[in-house]
Amino acid sequence: MTTAPQESNARSAGYRGDPIFKGCTRPAMLFGVPVIPLVIVGGSIVLLSVWISMFILPLIVPIVLVMRQITQTDDQMFRLLGLKAQFRLIHFNRTGRFWRASAYSPIAFTKRKRES
């Protein structure tokens, strides 16, 4: 006759979580820089060089080197900087402009119908 196993340690019981495979979350990189920030910065410099002067075009090399240094320790750094800009610098909510604060909740608030 078998019995239910005794749980000696409460931490080991239950859900332990799923493993995160770091390779699946890594952004596509070119020259050691994530592709999306590289395209945005490179495209901006190319547009400026067409509108202003072709002498601006060589600025791509040092800017890519600086971007490579930024992502050398953390490949998600530009994503984190973008999220910081989105949530701290750009206030899409009205209370952010007035109270200088923001609160984000995973709950979707819907209009409730009044019961009469």
Swiss-Prot record:
Induction: Specifically induced within macrophages by phagosome acidification. Induced at 37 degrees Celsius in minimal medium, suggesting that nutritional stress is a regulating signal. Keywords: Cell membrane, Membrane, Transmembrane, Transmembrane helix, Virulence. The chain crosses the membrane at residues 23-43, 45-65. GO terms for cellular component: plasma membrane. It is found in: Cell membrane. Its main location: membrane. It is a multi-pass membrane protein. The keyword Nuclease does not apply. The VirB system could be required for the establishment of the replication niche in the host. Belongs to the virB3 family. Transcription of the operon is maximal in early exponential phase. This is Type IV secretion system protein virB3.
